[in-house]
Amino acid sequence: MYGYLRETDDSTAINYSAYGKFLPGENTGFQLLTIGAKFLRIFRVNPYVLKEPGEDNEEWQQKTKLECMFSCRLLNKCQSVAVARVPQLPDQDSILMTFDDAKLSIVAVNEKERNMQTISLHAFENEYLRDGFTTYFNPPIVRTDPANRCAASLVYGKHIAILPFHENSKRILSYIIPLKQIDPRLDNVADMVFLEGYYEPTILFLYEPLQTTPGRACVRYDTMCIMGVSVNIVDRQFAVVWQTANLPMDCNSLLSIPKPLGGAVVFGSNTIVYLNQAVPPCGIVLNSCYDGFTKFPLKDMKHLKMTLDCSTSVYMEDGRIAVGSREGDLYLLRLVTSSGGATVKSLEFSKVCDTSIAFTLTVCAPGHLFVGSRLGDSQLLEYTLLKVTKESAKKQRLEQQNPSEIELDEDDIELYGGAIEMQQNDDDEQISESLQFRELDRLLNVGPVKSMCFGRPNYMSNDLIDAKRKDPVFDLVTASGHGKNGALCVHQRSMRPEIITSSLLEGAEQLWAVGRKENESHKYLIVSRVRSTLILELGEELVELEEQLFVTNEPTVAAGELLQGALAVQVTSTCIALVTDGQQMQEVHIDSNFPVVQASIVDPYVAVLTQNGRPLLYELAMEPYVHLREVNVNETSFATFSEQISTQLTSVSIYSDASQIMKKNTVDGRDEKPENAAENGHHVAVPKIKKEIPDDDAMLYGEDDDFLYGDAEEDEPMVAAESGESSTRLQNTRKRKRLGHDAIMSSRGGEQSDAIDPTRTYSSITHWLVVAHDNGRITIHSLPDLELVYQIGRFSNVPELLVDMTVEEEEKEKKAKQTAAQEKEKETEKKKDDAKNEEDQVNSEMKKLCEKVVEAQIVGMGINQAHPVLIAIIDEEVVLYEMFASYNPQPGHLGVAFRKLPHLIGLRTSPYVNIDGKRAPFEMEMEHGKRYTLIHPFERISSINNGVMIGGAVPTLLVYGAWGGMQTHQMTIDGSIKAFTPFNNENVLHGFVYMTQQKSELRIARMHPDFDYDMPYPVKKIEVGKTVHNVRYLMNSDIYAVVSSVPKPSNKIWVVMNDDKQEEIHEKDENFVLPAPPKYTLNLFSSQDWAAVPNTEFEFEDMEAVTAMEDVPLKSESRYGGLDTYLALATVNNYGEEVLVRGRIILCEVIEVVPEPGQPTSNRKIKVLYDKEQKGPVTGLCAINGLLLSGMGQKVFIWQFKDNDLMGISFLDMHYYVYQLHSIRTIALALDARESMSLIRFQEENKAMSIASRDDRKCAQAPMASEFLVDGMHIGFLLSDEHGNITLFSYSPEAPESNGGERLTVKAAINIGTNINAFLRVKGHTSLLDSSSPEERENIEQRMNTIFGSLDGSFGYIRPLTEKSYRRLHFLQTFIGSVTPQIAGLHIKGARSSKPSQPIVNGRNARNLIDGDVVEQYLHLSVYDKTDLARRLGVGRYHILDDLMQLRRMAYYY
């Protein structure tokens, strides 16, 4: 048994976040870093996102959003994160990450290549440091000094590693000190932070020298201590400078307070304490649960009646601290200072707003707070400080107080008047501030995935339903979130457009929607045929245009719009037609003997390419009338350049740049500044003309000097070339300041972002011509002068980084070309009589086709088209490169570079290699002598503002989302498409039109606005508002059964009196936090509106938990030899220690009833058929061969459902606690809480159940989920555990290590760094499979994929492999680590090996599972590296590509 594992979608939860300057460059601003399990993202705050008009307003509004600028995936889960400026990169922040068990990596974004660069690696994994431990290590913690002098990491909880950041050192050298060497009592460290304001780096430890538990609190409490340790990084010396003992025993975390206050805040579950070396401590207690269990002096705030366990906090400013609780509430902790403002005298704690359940809090730009969550959506909040006037505050206080309490006689005022007035002023200051929060943006999270199921495809158009389709079409529904963030998530792997109308157009090849009406809807639909063109007028219906406005007697090559849609342009084989307002304005005949094969239309230019590779350029002129004017290419520098390289052009396209990235370098290599540099949203350095105001004066007077004295400094001499421009900029700056512009920017987060305001850069849009040559070179020319500004050599190699060719490289390439031409002539003369000449010629032509760039376009994607992406088709693959600003030494050229994105789109459906082992012919052959464009950029389709549709056999949508960068979504459900165009109409707002390849059907469609296509897995999230535990789809009723719960505080305890349980109510005071056991309910959800079906709620008893819910097919008496499907539920009643644990088995069915008026979804009801209490806890359920298998504690029972009753057939004693069961035919997998997994076999003829085999590893971790891996006649068993391991077992009684079949044989074990709680099996996707023989296809179809969802929101699959593919990919996995450096320096074998590392006794070679995340890095290598690596493996690169592409497509469902 061999397998292939790959995570297809990255985690959506966020574990860590930080704010800093992570992207290199002078004008990049500050960014937000988020890490979720293994997925790292860097965001910028973009305040210029356009929001479409709503019902209230008719104009577009600007809003603030988080925009992903960089993302990457790690090999292993990150355990802790810190940020620092290291000496190697002083101009940007570096990221320090720790990994299991004691690894530390320092990484940063590389300026030249825009990838994650590893700066320093540190491994502290030593047998001596472990002190004999093999498991249960303390997680590694990393912290950095606020002054960037050093970093510290906790190693195995017993040692501290120090990393000094010496300024003149080229390397970061670390050293380790045992904690016991600092102080013998320093042990059991809970947290540590660096303190600010000390001469030397000082670490504050929170530790517990003598541990205690809540059960021993009556004898030992106040056990927590802190210790401040000064670190001398030069002499490697430690000194204890501060100690405080007898802190409350519930303290668990520290928060360092910056200057001028200093000190630290200690957070506990029930207490908050502020500590400072110079002032007495102060603290508060939050409830009465702690009464009698601490002697630490605490201020009474028990009226809050809350706890802070699992909380997180962050320091904001001015003594304010944001605290997030586990209930999803955000609190404000205020450090109240004395009159001098330097010492803290008390704490104030209050609730400010509701948020997601926070796991991390980070203060971003001024006035912005990021809430990162693992259980709900992460949020970007804006907060503003509200001040209440003293009169209103005093009036409010007078209303609240009793008049008799505030009456003061004359003697009091005469004696204490000043003190009374000061006290009243202090009270006014305390009450006059409050924070108001508002949500700006949220990052969607679909984790944790607790349960998932398949469901009927929702939103499925009738035109897409095909009875002959073999592959299933389904939705994946998951139970996600927790508490108030609980939700149902509906996932659709492929795009399913909503078909509005469909019609047959025989002979149609391409289509375009052009021309705009006043309401922005399209006027015409141009349909190109083989020898003619059909023009359809768009209105309520599609009607053929009778007027002769367009050219109809020739096929159309391209069509588009100029003047923002006012002018429709049609390019045919021989001419160009301009149409506006129902009349043809101009018809330009192209001066060429060869027909036009390609064209690009971008306002105000039209570029065409003829069949002989000659480019022609036209520009729209407005004087003396609107017409197209041809630009004489022969008079530009392009003609000279073409003669020098003497190549034929294969593609031309025009790019309109709105990102402000494409700027020419000046003579010294720097970027040229556009004319409106101060207007474009970048914070460009303005020449300083007015004098700087001293800091003290600025604090006192601010900018009042401008108002009082004007601008006398303006008369100072200026540089003549910039005087007018600079004065204009300064004048504009002054105007904005007077209008409060800075305050507006601060509230929107724009002052620390390099985002561009599109309203200011609209006038500075530049245009460029992208040209592809037949020798694999891509050049970029400026328009309209066609000057060469950038050239990419050897693009056919598809390197990871594209840079501008230097003059030396160009000369070298010319010489190599001349040498190759001479050698070719000699070989031609020698091989005139050789029989292999013809074969060599065929191979040479095939090689030329593989190196040919068929299409190349630069498309502006993302928010405000700020991310230019180079999309090219080469060797029947679509490759993507993202442009970024980079230093270019060549004057007059663009200061940009391109980095390859980890996305590869294959355009073939058949394998690259034939049966004879040779390269198969190209599928992208020219039809009728023409090759139509496959790259279709668009603006505004449904909720997607811009994107690209790739046509062909595998239609793919490209979206550059703000959530995580570039995402690809296939649309293969309707087969291959040969034409696509965006379409806007009164009936179909922001839709699209496409044409199928197979039947030439024209379909007008739109995308579902409810789904979020920014996500890697398109999803629709339905908020439920409570914890969702389980979800199951009932096919017969087309309904979803959902088990959920809400916490319900309880003061009851059950005791046994005379063999009966009785309730005892324990009265507690009103400030006591009562335990809140969950109250479970069962609901039916309809897929019509994704809401609970009215009047179907089934409530369970108090203290009763639902442990399992399954749809079980059981043998039915009503059907001869048939099965009826029922909904089965298992429950456990846990009333405490004294009452025996019982449980129930409930069998019910969903029946159809008459719906209530106005409630169409109320046509379903739950009918309970069986409901009885069992003699033990019912912990698992499944159906096995028409019978019901149930786990009850340490036993397994099998039942037959007959006469609405369960009749016991057989039982089996297991180990400790069986809590999950999975079955297939007559075998089942039983998971035990301590004894891993067992294989159960049921023999129906003997009514006997037995353990066939089990996993008896002593080092086995606690299991979480299991599933079968089906490979035709063979079957394997998958197991996930709490350490993130996935283990593959097989039943091999003939193997000696299986001990005659008693042991399950371990075939593979891998650690993916995330916990898996849900598996599903599904047939492989075979629609795009082009196998060589029916036998091979049958074998492939019998292999099933096992899908998994993790608690971090990621998804993946495991698929069986043939031995031939396994050996090929296994060798690839072994060698690929030497070619591709891994992020953070993680070693492939070390990072992905099972944890904890233990010898495996029941398996010989536990490496039979291929790591798809590693081997798929091969797809993103350059062609040279691919060929070299394949040669080392002894195969061709196309063989490996075929294996990987087939595995990808087998897992890409409808």
Swiss-Prot record:
GO terms for cellular component: mRNA cleavage and polyadenylation specificity factor complex; nucleus. It holds the Pfam family CPSF_A. The keyword Lipid biosynthesis does not apply. Residues 812-843 have a biased composition (Basic and acidic residues). Keywords: mRNA processing, Nucleus, RNA-binding. It is found in: Nucleus. Belongs to the CPSF1 family. This is Probable cleavage and polyadenylation specificity factor subunit 1. The gene is cpsf-1.
